[in-house]
Regions:
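S-adenosyl-L-methionine
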Residues: 1-60
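Class I S-adenosyl-L-methionine-dependent methyltransferase module
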Residues: 7, 63-163, 169
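Short amphipathic alpha-helical segments and helix-helix/interface helices
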Residues: 34-39, 152, 201-208
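Active-site regions of enzymes building and remodeling cell-envelope glycoconjugates
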Residues: 47, 62-68, 176-179, 224-237
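Short, polar loop motifs at secondary-structure junctions
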Residues: 50-55, 149-150, 217-223
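Short, glycine/acidic-enriched loop or turn micro-motifs at the edges of active sites
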Residues: 51, 72, 170, 185, ...
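Active-site segment flanking the S-adenosylmethionine/decSAM binding pocket
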Residues: 162-197
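Long, positively charged, glycine-interspersed low-complexity recognition regions
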Residues: 193-255
Length: 255
């Protein structure tokens, strides 16, 4: 790690405002559900130790945010987003008909970003547009002018975010924060390159219990590595499918 973040209860000078929209889609992302079901942060720093598409942090982007992500591709996309200019985003063209992301001649990180927009709700960037994108179904959900405009209008608002390509147990934050812990789920999280089979959930449960501040942990209903309670029946990224979500919080009793 290049730094250790000890104290967290300081907000940035970044203007408050409405929530940010997702910078990219990701399998299991929580952006839609974050405002409906999960507690609001009560600390000046939000930490997502399994960052993915950072759906929770996007709802409170004016706060200090630390994203930890073990997958170098996901971490690379976030590192690109916190540095890229709006003009650079607007200059990225559409994928040509019958073509792939490789035809755009982009930097690796930019290609990864677009790869998440040509096929939504995946755990890895794709190169060829999905049939939904090719058929122009819901164009605002795939790479094109509307998405370019959205991302370019938001990148300046995450300049203060910190990104770490590291595992949850290597997170540099040691002080109080709002911890939004959304790991690959124990029974269903094998769709990821760095999936649930690589996680020691007993250790993760102990780690969650010893974080300072507010701790929010996500899982499927029925998981037992921490005493979860049923949260909600939610829509998934798979057409017509729903899932029963569970939650554990420390109720602010760790200070």
């Amino acid at each position: 790690m290049t730094e250790e973040i000890v104290s967290a209860d300081i907000e940035t000078n970044t203007p408050r405002g409405s929530k940010l929209r997702p910078f990219f889609g990701f399998y299991g992302g929580k952006w839609r559900d974050a405002a409906k079901y999960y507690p609001s942060p009560d600390h000046g720093l939000i930490v997502e130790p399994f960052a993915g598409s950072a759906g929770y942090a996007l709802r409170y982007a004016h706060k200090r945010v630390v994203l930890c992500e073990v997958d170098p591709i996901i971490a690379g996309v976030w590192e690109y987003l916190v540095e890229v200019s709006p003009r650079e985003i607007l200059a990225i063209p559409d994928v040509p008909a019958g073509g792939t992301v490789d035809d755009l001649g982009l930097t690796q990180e930019a290609a990864w970003l677009i790869g998440f927009w040509v096929n939504r709700g995946v755990s890895r960037p794709r190169k060829r547009p999905s049939k939904w994108m090719r058929d122009r179904i819901s164009p605002g959900s795939f790479w094109g002018n509307r998405v370019r405009q959205t991302i370019s209008s938001q990148v300046e608002r995450i300049r203060h975010w910190k990104i770490y390509n590291c595992s949850w147990n290597e997170c540099p934050v040691t002080g109080s924060a709002t911890w939004f812990v959304d790991p690959p789920y124990q029974k269903t999280g094998r769709h990821y390159v760095y999936g649930s089979e690589e996680i020691d959930f007993k250790d993760l449960g102990k780690w969650c219990r010893t974080r300072k501040g507010q701790v929010i942990v996500c899982e499927n209903h029925g998981a037992g590595w921490i005493p979860f309670r049923r949260l909600a029946d939610v829509k998934t990224t798979r057409a017509g499918k729903r899932a029963v979500e569970a939650i554990w919080t420390n109720n602010g009793d760790i200070q």
